């Protein structure tokens, strides 16, 4: 570790532990009773130790006590380190709360994430895939193409903090580099902090957002009070110097405006070259932060669905069409892709993206998928295949409708293994079988588990 998040509190006890295994979020697990100094009344109690790895002997300071478990932070490694321990690449690791696994070898991170998915599938649904696919791996650094960065001005010190929240805290820690952020964006952080420090209205800036497309970069400044003309001009000159688009957002998303709109609309772009499609998006639109993993993910989804020319596909939670447009390429002009998304703005974005790529076989509808949608015409047309890419809450409300779609193949893309496992159990009840699954390292060095799963309808045999 490069740094420790906080100085040790003298009143909190320290003990020596033998670390046994890893928790789902990457903390070492140990038990009281493995050392003679342990309190007798705590023998057998579980301890979760931040930064500790299996097989290590560590000194740890207790940070939180509960009836059945305790939490601790490693303060010293007392013997040989685990073979899976590596040096964190970021100087802010241990203070910044963005990454939690930089001390773990990348292969072990992948292994842990697959174990998490496997455990959830077994616990919640009692199933395992017939085949585990090779994980989709990420670059180990410079992989994030967007970030929201907090801003806080300390008037007594006349100092502006630009950074991320500390681990389990609302307090910002100042950063001058970010090893997982796109290198050009990361290298710009000191210059950006100096710019914000020089503004008269710096106390009224809540955060900034950086987003990078294939060809453009945007800087969004969220401010709670109007910025004066001099400040806006300074921001404008900075953006012109960097070749960035500049956006100001004084209130909610509807207040977003681009400065110097004559230079173009509020758009950035990215391409999925394997499908010859190009997407336009706004700085506030949801896009996958990891371009490398996203392209591999979309390719794998299309391969798993084994689409044929002329087939019909339903894409639920379609967003701006990240899956829909490649799916439309796969089914060809005689096929059809129907994308459904709650946000009317994103539906319009997806429609525009389909038009710009001449994909007339893709159509989009706005619908809150947590509500009854059975009366809509698109829901009663029948489909050969279904793709579901829900938020963390999963797609439980949709599961009851799945038999009506008639899909032979379902690809479920998940950012939460618990809700994937829950929904998988319902799909099995509806006669689907989990054929293949893989983890995707969308957020490397963090505990977040992204995954993809293929379900196929079991063929009924008529006597």
UniProtKB/Swiss-Prot annotation:
UniProt-listed HAMAP family: 23SrRNA_methyltr_RlmD
Residues annotated as binding [4Fe-4S] cluster: 90, 96, 99, 178
Keywords, alphabetical: 4Fe-4S, Iron, Iron-sulfur, Metal-binding, Methyltransferase, rRNA processing, S-adenosyl-L-methionine, Transferase
Biological-process GO terms, alphabetical: rRNA base methylation
Matching InterPro entries: 23S_rRNA_MeTrfase_RlmD (IPR001566), MeTrfase_TrmA_AS (IPR030390), NA-bd_OB-fold (IPR012340), SAM-dependent_MTases_sf (IPR029063), TRAM_dom (IPR002792), U5_MeTrfase_fam (IPR010280)
PROSITE patterns hit by this protein: SAM_MT_RNA_M5U, TRAM, TRMA_1
NCBIfam families reported in the protein's UniProt record: PRK13168.1, rumA
PANTHER family named among the record's database cross-references: 23S RRNA (URACIL(1939)-C(5))-METHYLTRANSFERASE RLMD, RNA M5U METHYLTRANSFERASE
Catalysed reactions, semicolon-separated: uridine(1939) in 23S rRNA + S-adenosyl-L-methionine = 5-methyluridine(1939) in 23S rRNA + S-adenosyl-L-homocysteine + H(+)
Keyword hit for 4Fe-4S: yes
This protein's record includes keyword DNA repair: no
Gene name of the record: rlmD
Family according to the record: Belongs to the class I-like SAM-binding methyltransferase superfamily. RNA M5U methyltransferase family. RlmD subfamily.
Gene3D superfamilies according to UniProt: 2.40.50.1070, Nucleic acid-binding proteins, Vaccinia Virus protein VP39
Record-annotated active site: 415
Superkingdom of origin: Bacteria
Pfam families: TRAM (PF01938), tRNA_U5-meth_tr (PF05958)
One annotated GO molecular function: iron ion binding
Protein name: 23S rRNA (uracil(1939)-C(5))-methyltransferase RlmD
Domain TRAM: from-to ranges: 6-76
Biological function: Catalyzes the formation of 5-methyl-uridine at position 1939 (m5U1939) in 23S rRNA.
Binding-site positions, S-adenosyl-L-methionine: 288, 317, 322, 341, 368, 389
Native organism: Acinetobacter baumannii (strain ACICU)
Spans through the membrane: none
EC number: 2.1.1.190
